[in-house]
């Protein structure tokens, strides 16, 4: 059975770096590898939900900044449908830098989160929950 989920919350552009050791103060480290992907709690949950054969719809602030195209492209490749709460927003989307220590999987994250990406709830269509089996709100 395929479920349909609505995922509501933060979308970021994540720069994820794999490092052989954690960063220390005043240290510069060359990464072993990196990824640039759409991220954020609701976004990651939508991608995972879709990966397991379900249909995910993401309700979030995306906007029209050039960096947003990277987010939209990644979500499209993952099969996640999006509803943009502020499609005309031209500001830079929230960006996260994540350093993952290869040996342990421990990570350090710095991000602005949704501080500058608050949406007006009146934009949401009244029939948004039609044919939705599951709703996730990430708190952002």
Predicted regions and their residues:
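Generic internal hydrophobic packing segments that stabilize the cores of diverse globular domains
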Residues: 68, 72, 94-96
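Short, basic and Ser/Thr-rich N-terminal targeting/leader segments
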Residues: 52, 78, 91-94
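Thr-Gly-centered strand-to-loop micro-motif
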Residues: 32, 39, 95, 137-138
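Ribokinase/PfkB-type carbohydrate-kinase core domain
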Residues: 1-11, 61, 72-87, 99-140
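Short secondary-structure boundary/capping elements
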Residues: 37-44, 89-92, 116-121
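Glycine-rich phosphate/adenosyl-contacting loop at the front of the ribokinase-like
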Residues: 1-61, 66-70
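Residue-level signature of transmembrane alpha-helix interfaces in integral membrane proteins
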Residues: 25-26, 30, 95, 112, ...
